[in-house]
């Protein structure tokens, strides 16, 4: 059994027109045993910037805390909010430092540039190799199912409501076909002037 599927979990980000969305499931379990249904996998890293972490639950929390520490240092030193691309480099450095005994988590970053409000999404593997795309990124135990749903439903230049509907349908239908993710989904829609957070009900089995 892979360490990456020990706790299960799924995270996804999608790009729209002047907006991005990031979604994650809410399950924390140990293989088939369910522990809790409100586990946090998406963490704020700025006013319009979020990171989603799927993988081993202990490493999800460790990476989130260490990243927050580095982010606070960066903002104190630079006196400004971090750009999404810079955060990607910061995460890549953090993960690559531990490449011989890696953090078992594959991050997904979604946000808007603090000055230009240009949408940005990317994913990284567990040793910090980044992949920046213009459509969607996925991470977690049901990544094949998520890729299938996203390839079918995603279209360019979606408005925030359309983007929410698309990411929600993709996420809910993907986690329904995975035994170790699900138990509800949390979705953040990031726009220039507001962030909308919605919690979706899903199958609880």
UniProtKB/Swiss-Prot annotation:
Glycoprotein as UniProt keyword: no
Localization per Swiss-Prot or TrEMBL: Cytoplasm; Nucleus
Swiss-Prot/TrEMBL keywords: Acetylation, Cytoplasm, Nucleus, Proteasome
Residues that bear N6-acetyllysine: 77
Main location: cytoplasm
GO biological process, one term: proteasome-mediated ubiquitin-dependent protein catabolic process
SUPFAM superfamilies from the UniProt entry: N-terminal nucleophile aminohydrolases (Ntn hydrolases)
GO cellular component terms attached to this protein's record: cytoplasm; cytosol; nucleus; proteasome complex; proteasome core complex; proteasome core complex, beta-subunit complex
KW Glycoprotein (keyword) present: no
InterPro entries in the record: Ntn_hydrolases_N, Proteasome_beta_3, Proteasome_bsu_CS, Proteasome_sua/b, Proteasome_suB-type
N-acetylserine found at: 2
Family label: Belongs to the peptidase T1B family.
Free-text function comment from the UniProt entry: Non-catalytic component of the 20S core proteasome complex involved in the proteolytic degradation of most intracellular proteins. This complex plays numerous essential roles within the cell by associating with different regulatory particles. Associated with two 19S regulatory particles, forms the 26S proteasome and thus participates in the ATP-dependent degradation of ubiquitinated proteins.
Oligomer and partners: The 26S proteasome consists of a 20S proteasome core and two 19S regulatory subunits. The 20S proteasome core is a barrel-shaped complex made of 28 subunits that are arranged in four stacked rings. The two outer rings are each formed by seven alpha subunits, and the two inner rings are formed by seven beta subunits. The proteolytic activity is exerted by three beta-subunits PSMB5, PSMB6 and PSMB7.
PANTHER family recorded: METALLOPROTEASE TLDD, PROTEASOME SUBUNIT BETA TYPE-3
Official protein name in the record: Proteasome subunit beta type-3
The organism of origin for this protein: Rattus norvegicus (Rat)
